[in-house]
Amino acid sequence: MVHGFLSSNAQWIENIDALSEFCRPVTAELFGHGGSPSPDDVEYYHPNHYVSEFEKIRQDLNTTSWFVCGYSLGAALTARYSCLHFDRVTGHIMTNSNSAFASESQSKEWKKTAKKSGDNIQTGGLSAIEKIPVHPRHAKKLPSKIYAALEQDSVLLNPIGIANTLRATTPNASIRALAIENHSPALLCWGTQEKRFLESKIWAETNMPNLEITEIEAGHAVNMQKPQEFNQTVQSFLKKCATL
């Protein structure tokens, strides 16, 4: 289970116990986030390197196949892994992810501004990170328990790690070229209240094979705003995949 940009494993606190009743949740934090390191080498942050890291985790767990789950930017990374290692993936769960389904023009725009955005964060430090709209302190609609946990973890955000994420992860996150040949059963837990994701949802629905979509009346933070619905949806999906 991989969280989103400027988030941490704390975003799953209302999901872990419920999911543990029918599977073994394993969480991973992005470079520069939570307890993960912040390598200076920007290549560590490329989505393809994350795929390699996920495969190492699978091997360390000594499992031949598994379910993977990603949220937002994390979903772009787990979806990439799922497409490239479909023989190891029993099923893939993802939430709204504009980075995963970014168009070619959007990816080009991100690449054009990547260096400047990264440099601004590396120079400005935590105060610059706090100004980013998706910083946890701005997520006032989250349940108070999750909001407090994410805000507490936000002091662990590393300027070098966040800068390199903007330089290498986000600009290269789109899986459109891979998604059109998706082999693994995939579930999109669609937070219907996030209007800016609608175009991406339509693209995925039209172009990604083996994808099912479940509507959940929530915004971007679907697993945090509606944890019970998210947990039940994931459980149903896992049971369905187990019979395939």
State the predicted function of each range.
Residues 4-7, 72:
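Active-site glycine-rich loops that stabilize anionic/oxyanionic intermediates
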Residues 6, 30-34, 99, 219-222:
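Alpha/beta-hydrolase active-site loop signature
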Residues 13-17, 23-69, 73, 232-235:
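Active-site loop/oxyanion-hole signature of alpha/beta-hydrolase fold enzymes
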Residues 79, 83-84, 90-122:
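Flexible "cap/lid" loop of the alpha/beta hydrolase fold
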Residues 103-109, 122-180:
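Conserved alpha/beta-hydrolase catalytic His-Asp/Glu region
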Residues 183-218:
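Conserved loop-alpha-helix segment in the C-terminal half of the alpha/beta-hydrolase fold
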Residues 218-231:
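Catalytic histidine-centered segment of alpha/beta-hydrolase-like enzymes
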